[in-house]
Curated annotation (Swiss-Prot):
<dbReference type="GO" id="GO:0005829">
    <property type="term" value="C:cytosol"/>
</dbReference>
<keyword id="KW-0547">Nucleotide-binding</keyword>
<dbReference type="GO" id="GO:0005524">
    <property type="term" value="F:ATP binding"/>
</dbReference>
<dbReference type="Pfam" id="PF02224">
    <property type="entry name" value="Cytidylate_kin"/>
</dbReference>
<dbReference type="GO" id="GO:0036431">
    <property type="term" value="F:dCMP kinase activity"/>
</dbReference>
<protein>
    <recommendedName>
        <fullName>Cytidylate kinase</fullName>
        <ecNumber>2.7.4.25</ecNumber>
    </recommendedName>
</protein>
<dbReference type="GO" id="GO:0015949">
    <property type="term" value="P:nucleobase-containing small molecule interconversion"/>
</dbReference>
<comment type="similarity">
    <text>Belongs to the cytidylate kinase family. Type 1 subfamily.</text>
</comment>
<dbReference type="GO" id="GO:0036430">
    <property type="term" value="F:CMP kinase activity"/>
</dbReference>
<feature type="binding site">
    <location>
        <begin position="11"/>
        <end position="19"/>
    </location>
    <ligand>
        <name>ATP</name>
    </ligand>
</feature>
<dbReference type="GO" id="GO:0006220">
    <property type="term" value="P:pyrimidine nucleotide metabolic process"/>
</dbReference>
<keyword id="KW-0808">Transferase</keyword>
<keyword id="KW-0418">Kinase</keyword>
<dbReference type="InterPro" id="IPR027417">
    <property type="entry name" value="P-loop_NTPase"/>
</dbReference>
<keyword id="KW-0067">ATP-binding</keyword>
<keyword id="KW-0963">Cytoplasm</keyword>
<dbReference type="InterPro" id="IPR003136">
    <property type="entry name" value="Cytidylate_kin"/>
</dbReference>
Amino acid sequence: MCKGLQVAIDGPASAGKSTVAKLVAKKFNYVYCDTGAMYRAVTLAVLNQGIDPKDDKKVAEIARQIKIDFEPGEIEQRVFLDGKEVTHDIRLPKVAANVSAVAAVPAVREEMTKQQRQIAENGGIVMDGRDIGTTVLPQAPVKIFMVASAYERARRRYAENQAKGINTTSLEELQKAIELRDKKDSTRKVSPLTQAPDAIKLDTTNMTIDEVVSEISKIIKKTQDELA
């Protein structure tokens, strides 16, 4: 049997990467490495130890000391911090309020990249983000670059917010925000959003989630056959 592959899914904000990555991981019984959850776990550890999230030096020390693991769960993926399950704790409002400050520390990003590589070492993993195929897992045999028009991404986010009962700005405002985020992501100095030369570009503007999952699944199966 072919060993599980490393699957890297990159793309701009609101392209549906996480939704698709989770479904693909479930389909192949792979681990989904939620990179955002890792930064939340660091934030939780920082708060639990009574450290100021704005104290870059101490925050970086915590990031280097902790160990984060993922395990597939029935309903959602389980997250562990130093062996203790924190799946729900990392979603607490106090964590959400401080995660941006923690994630902005360069030493934290460096450490998380290192841990993400360790998690992916044995394969059988799906990871999504902005720089997975270019920076975190440049050797991944499957690299997908998911794109969709700014209007379509804004429309999806707008519909999602309405379904969740979240008060949101107009569709036009959402589109402007997404276009601004695209510009920031693609022009930042550290790990900018760019398509890896060997990544397969997938324009999902006119595709359903099921169609995207099906397309990526075909790519994974084809790669498995080639490497078998």
